[in-house]
């Protein structure tokens, strides 16, 4: 933002997998992020490996999930519904493949359906977009292109 070529009103973030959920966390904590794209980045905590949150809890990432909440999603004080809700009404594009073994698709839909109610309060339901390509843990080229168009549209950028 301190660089001349950065327009502080047109900052977006995009990430896949770990980068996908970190994009959502970034947006939740930094309102300068105006639009986000998450690819294969989350599912509901209860549906992440049948509720085993060990993958989230390693020492270099979120150790409190283990230390304080015993990797139990029922004890965790948040889920991705709340993360998505904090982003409203900002635009979020979600790539949630049908066969992602890491982030179960029905858990994504559970979170999105709940968060959509928050977006509705802002009359911004169209700002929460989900696609379900027929693939595994991947960000296929055609979905990437759709995500880039989403970013361009919401940041007001027209390719040259």
Where are each of the predicted segments found?
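Gly/Ser-rich "nucleophile elbow"/oxyanion-hole loop immediately N-terminal to the catalytic nucleophile
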Residues: 1-17, 33
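Loop/turn elements at helix/coil->beta-strand transitions in domains of secreted/extracellular proteins
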Residues: 8-10, 31-35, 88-92, 126
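Alpha/beta-hydrolase-fold catalytic nucleophile elbow
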Residues: 14, 39-40, 95, 133
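Flexible, active-site-proximal loop/turn residues at the rims of small-molecule/cofactor binding pockets
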Residues: 17, 42, 98
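Short glycine-enriched nucleophile-adjacent loop
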Residues: 20-31
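Mobile cap/lid helix-loop segments that gate and shape the active-site cleft of serine hydrolases
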Residues: 38-83, 89, 102-112, 120-124
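Conserved strand-to-loop "acid loop" that flanks and positions the catalytic carboxylate
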Residues: 88-106, 133-136
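C-terminal catalytic histidine-bearing segment of alpha/beta-hydrolase fold enzymes
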Residues: 112-160
